[in-house]
Amino acid sequence: MALSRYRECGPVAGLAQARQETSVSTQHYSDGQDIGKGNQDAPMSNDEAARLIGQAIGQVQRVIVGQERMVEQLMVGVLAKGHILLEGVPGVAKTLAVRSFATVLGGSFARVQFTPDLVPSDIVGTRIYSASKETFDIELGPVFMNFVLADEINRAPAKVQSAMLELMAERQVSIAGQTFPAPHPFSVIATQNPVESEGVYPLPEAQRDRFLLKIDVPYPRGNEEFEILRRMSVKAPQPQQVLTPEAVVALQDMASDVFVHNLVAEYVVRLVLATRNPGDFGMSDLANVIQIGCSPRATLGLVAAARALALVHGRDYVLPTDVQAVAVDVMAHRLVLSFDAIADNVSASDVIERVVAMVPPPTPVWNEEQRQTAQHNYPNDLGQYPAPTTPPAQL
């Protein structure tokens, strides 16, 4: 198969090795050989994983009309073991989507409504004196659940937001000198309203960087709003549980073992480097737009999210289009734009879309026999990945 090009070498084994290669193996994905598979003891096949994931997404879409991209990206974030920030105006089903996901995935769920008078002990827990025992007991907070909905997180003061950092980054909380680990699986899904400015505390860069994905949730389209009205005029549908926490952990392990070819890894690095030194990639005009580029967490996040998306689509290897599909959601919230860019109403999403458009993706290098085989068996893939006349560009 032509796309087996992205399944041959060991994952991120060395960028120099990938650059020296000039041909593609003629082995096809359908020949039954495990080329470059990360985990030979996977608990289920890719087809079975894709079927379960599809059923889970289908159950959520029984409740959520439209918003297909948000639903898919929520699944990607959970499978990538990441935290997710949903941004949208009130009433676009952010909270309902998270609650439905928790039901479908079978995990415990807690919703924390962030307010200006919230204190850290309200969310992580505190010591409580027991008169009968004459000792202090630890009362854990609501964040010790599989899925935590931090509703309107930007309404909480800085000390509460900072209390979330250890939990999100280390997946543990320290109370009175004791460390309490978060359960498995564990994801914080936060929401915020982009239009409100009174009584809000904007998330600092350090906390935004902890979120794997930031998903913009738009208004539903006209036909979708009509369907919402139709469904809610009768008994609202309820999602059914499809997975268990143990199954979610197994799927997360499968996602982390999805194969990443060296050429795709090199492409990820180039995308991130382009946000730090845009002039080196033919985008000198962005030098006055970007104040601070993406951190190395963006590099790791792109690979993790692309792996999860590949698993959602039933593949055990990552394509460049997987990276492109998650680039805006992974990278945009990590950029710090200049004051000039903000004054000109330039958004971080626009900048990332420009970077993705300007940085060329890797393409397989075929000889004539391989080209004819691919043209016969995978004509659609040829349309996306035309054979280049020169080897992939070096860093």
Predicted regions and their residues:
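C-terminal engagement/docking regions of AAA+ P-loop ATPases
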Residues: 25-32, 38-43, 280-395
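Conserved C-terminal "switch" segment of AAA+ ATPases
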Residues: 46, 50, 63-64, 200, ...
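Pre-Walker A (pre-P-loop) alpha-helix and adjacent loop at the N terminus of AAA/AAA+ ATPase modules
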Residues: 48-84, 89
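Conserved alpha-helical scaffold flanking the Walker A/P-loop in AAA+ ATPase domains
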Residues: 73-76, 129-149
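Walker A/P-loop
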Residues: 78-115
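Walker B catalytic acidic pair
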Residues: 88, 151-152, 163
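AAA+/P-loop NTPase substrate/partner-engagement loops
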Residues: 104-132
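Canonical AAA+ ATPase core
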Residues: 130-135, 152, 156-160, 168-258, ...
